[in-house]
UniProtKB/Swiss-Prot annotation:
<dbReference type="GO" id="GO:0006412">
    <property type="term" value="P:translation"/>
</dbReference>
<dbReference type="InterPro" id="IPR023803">
    <property type="entry name" value="Ribosomal_bS16_dom_sf"/>
</dbReference>
<feature type="region of interest" description="Disordered">
    <location>
        <begin position="114"/>
        <end position="161"/>
    </location>
</feature>
<comment type="similarity">
    <text>Belongs to the bacterial ribosomal protein bS16 family.</text>
</comment>
<dbReference type="GO" id="GO:0015935">
    <property type="term" value="C:small ribosomal subunit"/>
</dbReference>
<protein>
    <recommendedName>
        <fullName>Small ribosomal subunit protein bS16</fullName>
    </recommendedName>
</protein>
<feature type="compositionally biased region" description="Basic residues">
    <location>
        <begin position="124"/>
        <end position="133"/>
    </location>
</feature>
<dbReference type="GO" id="GO:0005737">
    <property type="term" value="C:cytoplasm"/>
</dbReference>
<dbReference type="GO" id="GO:0003735">
    <property type="term" value="F:structural constituent of ribosome"/>
</dbReference>
<dbReference type="InterPro" id="IPR020592">
    <property type="entry name" value="Ribosomal_bS16_CS"/>
</dbReference>
<dbReference type="Pfam" id="PF00886">
    <property type="entry name" value="Ribosomal_S16"/>
</dbReference>
<keyword id="KW-0689">Ribosomal protein</keyword>
<keyword id="KW-0687">Ribonucleoprotein</keyword>
<dbReference type="InterPro" id="IPR000307">
    <property type="entry name" value="Ribosomal_bS16"/>
</dbReference>
């Protein structure tokens, strides 16, 4: 049985994503595969190429023939050079720089603000309804005291005149 290492297409219309699969040479492009050994996303920057090197070496050693696009990917990852015994087995794969964590970005922004907002809430918490009921009676008492004080103040002013 002739075995090929080929790409099977996934993804949307303008966003192709491929699996690197080992399949019988007679099967259609997206047909049944024997084993999936990697994935390739060409639209990402830099392109995502993940190949299980151990499985690729095995399939190449038992006679699986890579298609032209897969051969290029194997050369980029260095698996083809390793299989053939050529120099450059480390490959020339570009690696995406790791994203900084959101916590680190937040802490850096706080440090840059120097005395700006802290990690505490910026809005005061709302009082619960039970506290409002108790506070409402207290507010009514305080308002009554203010009215009495202003009434006494008016009486003293009229008495002085």
């Amino acid at each position: 049985m002739a075995v090929k290492i080929k790409l099977t297409r996934l993804g949307k219309i303008r966003n192709p994503q491929y699996r690197i699969a080992v399949a019988d040479a007679r099967t259609r492009r997206d047909g049944r595969s024997i084993e999936v050994i990697g994935r390739y996303h060409p639209k990402e920057e830099p392109s995502l190429i993940e190949i299980n090197s151990e499985r690729a070496q095995y399939w190449l050693s038992v006679g699986a023939q890579p298609t032209e696009p897969v051969l290029k990917l194997l050369k980029i990852t260095g698996d083809w050079q390793k299989f053939k015994g050529l120099p450059g087995a480390e490959g020339r794969l570009k690696v995406k720089p790791p994203k900084p964590s959101k916590l680190e970005l937040f802490n850096a922004a706080l440090a840059a603000a120097e005395g700006g907002p802290t990690t505490e809430a910026t809005k005061p918490k709302k009082k619960s309804p039970a506290k409002k009921a108790k506070g409402g009676e207290g507010d009514a008492d305080a308002a009554a005291e203010k009215v009495e004080a202003s009434a006494e103040g008016e009486q003293t002013e009229s008495a002085e005149s």
